[in-house]
Amino acid sequence: VDSLAQALRPFCVDLVVPTAPSVLQLRNVLHLATEVRGVLHPAGPPLLTLADALHPTAAVGGTPTPDAVSTIGELEAMDRGRYAGPVGWVDAAGDGELGIALRCAQVVDRFARLFAGCGIVAGSDPDSEVAEAAAKLVPIRDALEGVY
């Protein structure tokens, strides 16, 4: 949250950062969520400038970002493809809305490669993190199988 606020601060005339997260309950997982809200400067930056300042967020790239992204590149044995990239729409004026593809699928022909991640920190238990990632993939799998 701190790195997100730090990245947004130069673009905002007002920024509200809650001191504590809330619990976001989804069908099969719980998340800690912090809703950061800001008001952009009147001449506000283009959407893609904001996306560039925010991507990758600490949630997917770690912090400090340059060091963490470098370490992930050295240790992670997979190509993330579009995982954790910005997704959304941008119009001809540069306005739009973007989110982060934290859970996504890349579908080619009859095959789908599913992506989900976990927040790895010093005290993380690898088995618990794998179980969490598996739980996060269930809605994508179910949607692809027509369960919903």
Where are these regions (language model features)?
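Contiguous alpha-helical scaffold segments within structured protein domains
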Residues: 1-73, 145-148
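Glycine-rich, small/acidic residue-mixed loop/short-helix segments
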Residues: 58-148
